[in-house]
Amino acid sequence: MDKPSGLLTLWGGSGLNLDMMNQREFRNALGHFATGITVVTMREGDTVHGITVNAFMSVSLDPPLVAVSIDRQATAHQTLNKTNRYGVSMLGSDQEHLSNHFANRFAAEVVEPFIEVDGFPLVNGALAHLICDIEVAHEVGDHTIFIGQVKHIAVNDKKPLLYYQGKYVGLGD
């Protein structure tokens, strides 16, 4: 089969050898897929934890299910394994600093970015909020996919924060 015009082959060919593909090439290829940015929050006792996640997706409309994929080495992974609930805050275009903060990147000091909804922490001013009860967790590769049933949803009218090819972009960029 001929390669579609305009595509550059980085690896592979007739005898595809996945061992030849390195993580950087894989990440670069996936970087061509624009994603929204979320902060996944959870509570452990009186402590609130949050982690920046762009591996977020809807799974089902009936019942309403979403999934987040969390690296098993992340502190948030251990916390999610101890709880039965998580929040998803879809970040707006004005919240890049919060994405960086929860990704452990250098960011300006963040002063209490959370609001409480039904006693659960969510990022203040986000594009949308979900509160989910964990239905199932699947360990796959070096991540765990946490599937949650949506119990609360709220939406604000603003533009999303997007990530494409290793940088933040806006709609129309």
Where are the model-predicted features located?
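Basic, polyanion-binding surface patches
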Residues: 4-173
